[in-house]
Amino acid sequence: MTKKNFEQLSDLNAEFFESAKLSLLDPLGLYLANDVKWIKLNQNWNSLKFPVVMGGKGQPILLLHGFDSSFLEFRRIYKSLKRNFQVIIPDLLGFGFSPRCATNEYNSSKIISHLIDLLKTLKITKNLKIIGASMGGSTALKLAYEIPDSIDKI
């Protein structure tokens, strides 16, 4: 596939999400979905756009969902956390609304690489707090091992 094909697929993914979110019945889910930003990553990820919920100000806090889930997992606590933190909730690589053509490999190492590139793109290099649910918890530990100087608390 060409770079243009990847970009077109990425745009279609974002367009699909924007129309699909309107069918969310849970008001907290819709509140969270309205804060999704599509963050374009580097060539390692075919320059695709990835969905990341971002809101609030303050110390950054990264929320990592569990297996077979999405950023919507945190809809019940997002509004509350957003009052005091810069909340960042990505869909983990290969889950939720993340583009499936970003890589042909989906494993814990790729998920960590993806998160590191996302944090670099967002210029988050220190004082990061992480909350991980289920698989997101083990991902948080692996991420802290890889970038210990960036992590404040898990």
Describe each region flagged by the PLM.
Residues 1-61, 82-85, 124-126:
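Alpha/beta-hydrolase fold catalytic core
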Residues 84, 122-154:
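Conserved hydrolase catalytic core segment
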Residues 48-97:
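Conserved HGGG/HGGXW glycine-rich cap/lid loop of the alpha/beta-hydrolase fold
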Residues 30, 35-46, 50-53, 89-131:
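Active-site loop/oxyanion-hole signature of alpha/beta-hydrolase fold enzymes
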Residues 75, 116, 141-145:
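Short, hydrophobic alpha-helix immediately C-terminal to the catalytic nucleophile
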Residues 61-63, 71, 99-101, 137, ...:
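Basic, gly/Ser/Thr/Pro-rich low-complexity segments located predominantly at protein N termini
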Residues 78-81, 104-106, 146-149:
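Glycine-rich, phosphate-binding/catalytic loops in enzymes
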